[in-house]
Swiss-Prot record:
GO molecular-function terms, A-Z: mRNA binding; translation repressor activity
Protein's recorded name: Protein Smaug
GO biological process: negative regulation of translation; nuclear-transcribed mRNA poly(A) tail shortening; regulation of DNA-templated transcription
PANTHER family: PROTEIN SMAUG (PTHR12515:SF5), STERILE ALPHA MOTIF DOMAIN CONTAINING PROTEIN 4-RELATED (PTHR12515)
Source lineage: Eukaryota, Metazoa, Ecdysozoa, Arthropoda, Hexapoda
Organism encoding this protein: Drosophila simulans (Fruit fly)
Amino acid sequence: MKYATGTDNAMTSGISGQTNNSNSASNEMQPTTSTPTAVHKEATSTATTTATYANGNPNPSANPSQSQPSNALFCEQVTTVTNLFEKWNDCERTVVMYALLKRLRYPSLKFLQYSIDSNLTQNLGTSQTNLSSVVIDINANNPVYLQNLLNAYKTFQPCDLLDAMSSSSSDKDSMPCYGSDFQITTSAQCDERKLYARKEDILHEVLNMLPLLKPGNEEAKLIYLTLIPVAVKDTMQQIVPTELVQQIFSYLLIHPAITSEDRRSLNIWLRHLEDHIQAAAAGLTNRSYFLQPSPQLVAGGSSTGSGSCSSSATSSSTASCSSVASSSLCPASGSRSSRTNDWQTIAPPSKQLQNKLAGDWRGSGGGSSSGSINPLCDNLNGITLNELASSQNSLGLSLEGSSSLVNGVVAGAGSMLGIGGGDDHDTSFSKNGTEILDFDPVTADMGEACSLASSSLCGRNGGNTVEDRSQPPPNLQQQLLQPPPYASILMGNVGDQFGEINRWSLDSKIAALKTRRSNSLTTQTISSCSSSSNSSVITVNDNCSNSTENLAQFANKPRSFSLSIEHQRGALMNSGSDTRLDEFKPNYIKFHTRNVGMSGIGLWLKSLRLHKYIELFKNMTYEEMLLITEDFLQSVGVTKGASHKLALCIDKLKERANILNRVEQELLTGQMELSTAVEELTNIVLTPMKPLESPGPPEENIGLRFLKVIDIVTNTLQQDPYAVQDDETLGVLMWILDRSIHNEAFMNHASQLKDLKFKLSKMKISMVPKMHHVKPAGVGPNNGNINKPRWNGKTRKCDTKSGSNDRINNRKNSNDMLNFSLNCLPHPLPHHSQQAPPPLPQFDYNGYGGGPSHQPQYKSSSYPSFMGNPQQQPPPPPSSKSHHHPQQMQQMLQQHNHFPALPQQTPPQSHRRSLNNLILVAGGPQQPQQLIFKPGQGVLTNNGSNDNLGLERNQQPQQQQQRKLSGGVSSAEQQPKKTMAAVVMENLAKFDQHFTLF
């Protein structure tokens, strides 16, 4: 039914279809209304008027310029809805109220709760049937009573009737039924109608008790679910009315006691029932109580887009499109009724079979059938699918693009029939080339409840009004009576291709349709409902009941990419690697489980290169894992090589206690090296272990023994002076500690392990690196200083072209003026001990050196020559005690003679580095000079140093004489022994007096 916003077309789309106004409808229903109902109607009328004045514009689509008051328009709408509500049965009213309650806010819901409690109290106090209501409430939750009722329903079958009629005995054998107050007797004189009526009475009683089922009563719920397959079978055999079974389905699909797994089991039976309803509506059966097409429904359905909401219009249009495509491609739909249905092969819904159901056929067939046959449920679908949120699951779905009830139609029939329902439907393509239905099961089931309730209403009213209405056009009637495409595809193709529907047996193994390799980390329950040439529709189910079902599912899983988490299709097609080990991350395969000691099973399998079999251990306990054998692994589909390797590794897990005990004893006695013990710990740290606090014998506590061995190894490294502290051993031990910190078995000891790891890290840092040799004290230019062992003059590059032994500076940010060469200092030369050192060159302020002009120069001015001509170097000063102070002063002045002088004419040259060009030296003597500044060159300043320079000139002849007198003394005794650090500090102290850097 389409809810209309105006009053003109409100009644044209109603159930009766007659042109009755609100007053006549109100008067028509008045005799059947009791006095309390009239009081409530009066109160409702007053509340309606008050709400109208409070709301200035109750109808946004109405024209503000209309003369009719807005309160009158709202009152008429309320009256219309009330009249329609009065014409519905109890199941339809319950479904509508359930759908409308989902659209209310919390204050309104609390108000209705208080009102309902008050109404229940008044009815129990004033009603004459309060005792019977209490009895029904008790029986509805009594498993014994319900089981007797179910046994009574199952007792009478058509075969029993034929046997009773063929018998010649005239005695009456009565069989009591404990589920109700009546007696069911089977005799030769009982006819078919009486048997059908008695079964129908049992279904009526179940229909009255089902709403009173309390959530949490699992035994009673299981009996209600067990009745469904038998009732559907009787409906197919035309024994009980279809509308009764539909109403039972409506209650079950919205009942808070029914879980999502129960709804999945119900959806299979619901598809068969809808297929039978469509076949009956098409005229294939001639039972009077089956669903018949109603002309007023066709008239109401023709005005779909006039006053309905957008979601309902979209739903009906998409469903009609699917019906047209289905009718054009499947004209011989009547042949489906001739197939044999072996209903006994499908087990009744139970907790053990909920995870093995063949597919998740939900939310599609009922929605499409209701949209094409009865437009009553279209608006109810819009109500339920807009803001529904039950206490069990969230039912909120957006109504963008297409209604959610036809998303299953688009998903199932889109690839086979070429129907597209929109770009934003709830069907997503997986990375393996198959389709995954990811719509909300509870929302779809809510739509099923709406369709079932409305269909039962049509079945009740269709026979009364069919004589007074003209038949719709043939093409429109054929379109409306076409079976739902989704159910026909899933059911018809199976019947046409495989013969009988017993191939849907839930007890047999579910065949896996292998398309492309799927992710082994994705738990999938794959069901095949069509041939391999068509696209399969699979549902992702992560709720596995036990490990046996996991193994059964694993046996049928296709070969998979081991660790591909999320990849695009192009990456999967172009990749040449099957294992994708480079993308492995530890958190990808670390799943949360309730089984103690099994959270790290993924890392252990990864270390064995068997991580693709992680699904075997998802819901397996620690004890069950240790009992796995090679034969068992091969029986569930593991390859021969992998099963053999995994079985050997599991056998090694049982030997861990003995290995750790042996390592502990040998470490205490000194018979085992630390490297061997660390290697044993490496093999055990990734294995699954129970926490230390787990109950059990101490000899089986692997975690406790593991910590004991770690404690012995670390104490030996820290305290034993004879222990070999190997850098590699320390690194492996720190890795073991890091793995242990994140292990489930040592979660309560993580802080202690972290402290131990920190101590080992400090020990590792304090160890001398292997690659650097420590020189003894007094040897080399550093005099045994190991603070900077890497930087010495021998390991640096030297200038081989100019014949100099100076180091070449290769740093980009180096400053040539700060790199003081050790050649400026007098060094001992054993092989030239009898020769006096050459004199140092004299500086000239004009840039002219004291030596010859052919002094070797670097190609770049950024590399000035720090080595003067050996013939121009002055001899070392004599080592006389009387001249100790003058010699020290002279030496300090001579330390600056190694700086280069400015050349006369230097052609422009290319420099490799530009940072040296930023160094400029300002100042100079007060006399006028003509200097050509080149990049990387410096000029001495006279900032208070003229006196020192003059003193240096005056002392030059004296130095010459002193060097001649001390020629016979060895050079080794004359040279002062200074370290490089002392020379650098002295140069830096005098640097500010001679240079100014910009």
